[in-house]
Design a protein with these regions (language model features):
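Structural signature of eukaryotic scaffold interfaces centered on beta-propeller domains
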Residues: 25-32, 91-106, 152-168
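Blade-edge beta-strand/turn elements of extracellular beta-propeller
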Residues: 4-20, 72-91, 130-144
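Generic long, charged, amphipathic alpha-helical segments
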Residues: 121-176
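Short beta-strand elements that form the blades of beta-propeller/WD-repeat-like
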Residues: 3, 36-41, 106-119, 169-177
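Long, internal scaffold/assembly segments composed of regular secondary structure
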Residues: 3-59
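Short, solvent-exposed loop/turn segments at conserved positions within beta-propeller repeat blades
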Residues: 50-68, 120-126, 179-183
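Short, small-residue-biased leader/transition segments that mark boundaries at the very start
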Residues: 1-2, 186
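Beta-rich catalytic cores
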Residues: 25, 105, 125, 149, ...
Length: 187
């Protein structure tokens, strides 16, 4: 892991040793005194195994079974210490936050729920939306329903919103497709 001071040059790069993982999406990053805090989705297995019963496309399908969870890293710029751990262990990814809070402490993150293979999941299908309170680790979950799948969501703050407003005052937007009525999609 590396950081470069926003006021520095390439010579200011710092390396930090973390538990091995793959990070597809970061929710947010901010400073707290000597610490840089980063929330994101952590995968411990970026090279999943294929199952033999899926034929010649099995290796491609294996990569579409993303296993990741909401995770927090803390990097101390003064001492080099790293603290890290799960915020939650639910399989989620494609995380978003209110863009007004990019680079400053944020409380909420919105993730797509991805069922694991042993939960009846197949490939990268989003079956629900999960709202995390990263301060408490609590979550609210909305399932789209049987045969209904969502797209990567975006967060849209209400018109005219600033960081003086409630961080959660906006809209999480995803396109949802009902595969039972393929000619119909919902926002």
């Amino acid at each position: 892991m590396l950081f470069r001071s926003r006021h520095g040059s390439g010579g200011d790069i710092r390396w930090f040793d973390c538990e091995p993982c793959y990070i597809l999406h970061v929710s947010n990053c901010w400073e707290e005194g000597d610490w840089v805090v980063m929330d994101g989705c952590r995968s411990t297995n970026p090279m999943p195994s294929a199952t033999s019963d899926e034929g010649e496309l099995s290796h491609m399908l294996a990569y579409m079974r993303l296993e990741a969870n909401n995770y927090r890293w803390r990097f101390n710029l003064r001492t080099g210490e790293v603290r890290e751990g799960d915020i939650d262990d639910l399989n989620t990814e494609f995380n978003k936050t209110n863009p007004l809070y990019a680079g400053v402490k944020s409380r909420y993150a919105y993730h797509q729920r991805i069922p694991l293979l042993e939960e009846g999941g197949h490939t990268l299908r989003f079956t629900g939306l999960v709202k995390y309170d990263n301060n408490t680790g609590s979550r609210q979950q909305w399932d789209y329903g049987d045969g209904v799948f969502g797209s990567e969501a975006v967060y849209a703050p209400k018109a005219g919103a600033t960081r003086d407003n409630d961080e959660d005052d906006g809209y999480v937007i995803t396109l949802v497709t009902d595969t039972r009525e393929i000619g119909r999609a919902h926002v």
